[in-house]
Regions:
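Short, small-residue-biased leader/transition segments that mark boundaries at the very start
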Residues: 2-3
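Short, acidic/turn-prone active-site loops that include or flank metal/cofactor-
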Residues: 7-11, 30
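Short, charged, low-complexity patches
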Residues: 10, 40-44, 136-144
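Predominant activation on well-ordered alpha-helical scaffold segments within soluble catalytic domains
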Residues: 14, 44-52, 91-94, 148
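C-terminal catalytic subdomain
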Residues: 20-72
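Catalytic-core signal marking the mid-to-C-terminal active-site face
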Residues: 57-156
Length: 156
């Protein structure tokens, strides 16, 4: 297994990278961490690695992009009340989807065969952020909305 998950945040990612001896790391926001340069997000290193890969492959950007599958992301949120026990809701969601692949390193991520949903509570306001990804924008939005409905029902 060459892919390791870690909680969001540069310090969390770099700590895990050092622990496992990773040669590259990053976050969903596009931040690239390349220890051969330094243990910090660096946009220029990301650009240099991309250009180096293009040169090595001898391809145009469009050709390289066409060689990868397309995924679409939807970002939503469920607004709750300050009295809501967000941790209890996330635990219930985890139980409801126990037959799917679940990762709870940073919230609750549910991996379905052809899509995923990641639920993260806010540390500053009573909300759950709902990130979803699928092969079409509609499918990403649909699975996000389905899980949001589950959360809203649990919060009643």
């Amino acid at each position: 297994d060459v892919y390791k998950r870690q909680a969001v945040g540069e310090v969390n990612v770099t700590t895990k990278m050092k622990e496992v001896g990773a040669v590259i790391g990053g976050e969903g926001n596009g931040g690239v961490i390349y220890p051969a340069s330094h243990y910090g997000r660096d946009a220029l290193v990301g650009i240099a690695l991309f250009l180096s890969h293009l040169a090595h492959e001898g391809k145009k950007v469009s050709e390289l992009r066409a060689s990868y599958p397309a995924y679409f992301m939807a970002k939503n949120r469920v607004d709750l009340t300050p009295e809501t026990d967000v941790d209890a809701i996330l635990a219930k969601v985890k139980e409801l989807y126990k037959n799917e692949e679940i990762n709870d390193i940073d919230g609750v991520k549910i991996d379905f065969p052809d899509k995923w949903v990641h639920l993260r509570k806010s540390n500053t306001e009573p909300i759950i952020r709902v990130y979803s990804e699928a092969a079409t924008p509609e499918a990403a939005e649909e699975i996000g909305q389905q899980i949001m409905k589950v959360i809203e029902d649990l919060a009643k």
